[in-house]
């Protein structure tokens, strides 16, 4: 029997870990995933009733979801149609002869939801987060991160070979010949090599403040003289922009490697494969399963999701917020909403008091931190209204499933471009209410807690206040802490990139965050080594979350440190496949679940007194090595 003093996570979760079985179609199981599975089961059962015409809500948007779901579930028609629905689009790209043929249709492809290899988007300006601006990013790589392309990376050749094998099998299902497949994949891999040589690694892209490179539009155009950008932006924006924010500077400095006559054969092959990948979910069952083979292998998942579950997941995509709103109204009581709102307000008050008593910040920086905290916007449970564009997602029952999906994509693309040069919409939710998650948005300075996470084991009106604070309390305070993590600290109360620290305070902050980096850096997870720098912002948020939640718990008359720490250890219960855990160690900004418990709790004196942890015990950490930031 593992003692709490030696391995806190295992003492709580070890027995469960030994017997827990990971479903064959999943990479992991545990707290978050189990809750997500419960919700999926409920939604599957409910939407099955709707398909049968039972208990269908009187709602036009959900009525269109049901129609779309019916199209997705018509497996017989999908099998009969085969690849026919995508053939016109494939032909369109195969008939592009020259780079000029392609560039003449850039805007048309963009607005139609067709591939064009242009990584533009609209998001808040870092320097004035109240307005949306144009950003220029970069395409993603085939391998999980640029670090995988190093000559000495142990998985490089293995994964590239795997990608080629799985892609070959997929393309055969689209009736490409062996010669065509070999040619397409070699060209795609060559373009991918070029991308991997210049795009940011996950570690580099995790430092937000270093991603902001503003360019005057005329200067930006010089990166890619072969692209008719004036015509493109006139078509999608109605005018040319005055500036472009570039987060992937190296990519655009090398733009002629991607957008040129020389690169055209590679780009054309990539576009054809993009059309294939765009269509895989909407055609036959064989194609759907083949298309997921590479990602399943990366995560060690032995089986594809069954077709009924996959159909629900696909159908809900364009209607997620509407389904989330239905779920929240069914499952999230007004009493629970009021209680969580109170908890969030309490947590913000605790944070203010902790900041006011902070002994390593000067009053100047401390006051500015409190200003930021005072205007943080909490969103609890569900959005007050659905996005207006959902009314435009009307199913054409005479069109194919694939064509309906493209039509829905056009609605989203039109909406995305319409935000350019407009004020930021603070009412917009980034995830639906039935998703088991939460987030902080540094550009909007808001925290969001969907209804799905506001239940056991994270939160339950029937469990003790200390258990709730160790669960949802720590999650709430974690998201608040993101306002002051290594990324959030660079943004002011309006979400703008601004240095609001004194030089000495920021130096002290960096010193403390370096200690957090050191605590995690080099830790082992299933044979993979944790990168303390990649995970630092999430680890700082965890640390601040525990500190504030623990203090809030202490204010309750029934406070129990044991129940607090125990539930904190329990919510991170997780069992993952070895391949998946190794992948996470390379690419995830979150530390593995076990380390989020075992590396964090020894920073708190209360942990040592509660569990009588002594020097020589596995969980021991000397007082001078403990770190508290917020």
Q: Where are each of the predicted segments found?
A:
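Zinc-dependent metallohydrolase catalytic domains
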Residues: 5, 41, 59, 63, ...
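Active-site-proximal beta-strand/loop segments in catalytic clefts of secreted hydrolases
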Residues: 11, 139, 450-452
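Short secondary-structure subsegments characteristic of cysteine-rich extracellular domains
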Residues: 24-47, 179-198, 468-474, 561-565
């Amino acid at each position: 029997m593992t003692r709490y003093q030696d391995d806190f996570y295992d003492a709580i979760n070890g027995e469960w870990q030994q017997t827990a079985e990971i479903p064959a179609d999943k990479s992991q199981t545990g707290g978050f995933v189990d809750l997500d599975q419960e919700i999926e089961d409920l939604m599957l059962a409910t939407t099955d009733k709707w398909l049968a015409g039972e208990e269908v809500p009187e709602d036009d948007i959900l009525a269109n979801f049901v129609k779309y779901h019916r199209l997705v579930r018509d497996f017989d028609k999908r099998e009969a149609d085969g690849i026919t629905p995508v053939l016109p689009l494939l032909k369109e790209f195969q008939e592009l002869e020259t780079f000029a043929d392609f560039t003449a249709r850039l805007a048309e492809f963009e607005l139609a939801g067709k591939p064009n290899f242009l990584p533009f988007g609209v998001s808040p300006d870092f320097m004035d987060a109240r307005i949306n601006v144009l950003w220029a990013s970069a395409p993603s790589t085939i391998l999980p991160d640029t670090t995988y392309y190093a000559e000495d990376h142990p998985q490089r050749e293995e994964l590239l070979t795997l990608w080629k094998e799985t892609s070959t099998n997929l393309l055969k299902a689209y009736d490409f010949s062996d010669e065509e497949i070999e040619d397409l994949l070699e060209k795609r891999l060559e373009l991918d090599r070029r991308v991997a040589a210049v795009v940011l690694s996950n570690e580099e892209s995790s430092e937000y403040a270093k991603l902001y490179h503003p360019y005057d539009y005329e200067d930006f155009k010089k990166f890619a003289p072969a692209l008719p950008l004036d015509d493109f932006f006139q078509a999608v924006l109605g005018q040319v922009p005055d500036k472009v924010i570039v987060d992937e500077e190296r990519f655009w400095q090398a733009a002629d490697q991607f957008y040129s006559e020389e690169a055209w054969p590679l780009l054309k092959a990539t576009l054809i494969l993009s059309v294939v990948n765009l269509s895989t979910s909407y055609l036959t069952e064989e194609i759907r399963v083949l298309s997921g083979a590479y990602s399943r292998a990366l995560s060690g998942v032995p089986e594809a999701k069954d077709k009924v579950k996959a159909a629900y997941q696909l159908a809900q995509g364009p209607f997620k917020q509407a389904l989330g709103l239905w779920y929240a109204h069914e499952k999230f009581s007004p009493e629970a909403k009021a209680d969580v709102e109170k908890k969030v307000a309490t947590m913000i008050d605790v944070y203010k008091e902790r900041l006011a008593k902070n002994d390593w910040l000067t009053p100047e920086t401390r006051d500015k931190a409190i200003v930021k905290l005072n205007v943080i916007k909490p969103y609890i449970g569900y959005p007050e209204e659905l996005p207006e564009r959902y009314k435009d997602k009307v199913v054409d029952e005479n069109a194919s499933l694939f064509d309906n999906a493209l039509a829905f994509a056009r609605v989203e693309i039109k909406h995305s471009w319409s935000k350019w040069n407009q004020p930021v919409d603070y009412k917009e939710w980034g995830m639906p209410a039935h998703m088991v998650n939460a987030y902080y948005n540094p550009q909007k300075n808001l925290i969001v807690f969907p209804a799905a996470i506001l239940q056991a084991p994270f939160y339950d009106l029937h469990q003790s206040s200390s258990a709730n604070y160790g669960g949802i309390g720590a999650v709430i305070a974690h998201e608040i802490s993101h306002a002051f993590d290594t990324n959030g600290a660079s943004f002011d109360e309006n979400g703008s990139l601004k240095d609001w620290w004194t030089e000495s305070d920021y130096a002290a902050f960096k010193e403390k965050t370096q200690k957090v980096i050191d605590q995690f850096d080099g830790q082992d997870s299933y044979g993979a080594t944790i990168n303390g720098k990649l995970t630092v912002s999430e680890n700082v948020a965890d640390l601040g979350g525990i500190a504030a939640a623990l203090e809030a718990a202490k204010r309750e008359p029934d406070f129990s440190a044991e129940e607090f720490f125990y539930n904190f250890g329990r919510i991170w219960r997780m069992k993952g496949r070895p391949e998946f855990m190794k992948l996470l160690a390379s690419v995830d900004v979150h530390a593995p679940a076990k380390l989020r418990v075992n590396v964090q709790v020894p920073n708190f004196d209360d942990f040592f007194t509660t569990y009588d942890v002594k020097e020589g015990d596995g969980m021991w950490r000397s007082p001078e090595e403990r770190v508290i930031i917020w």
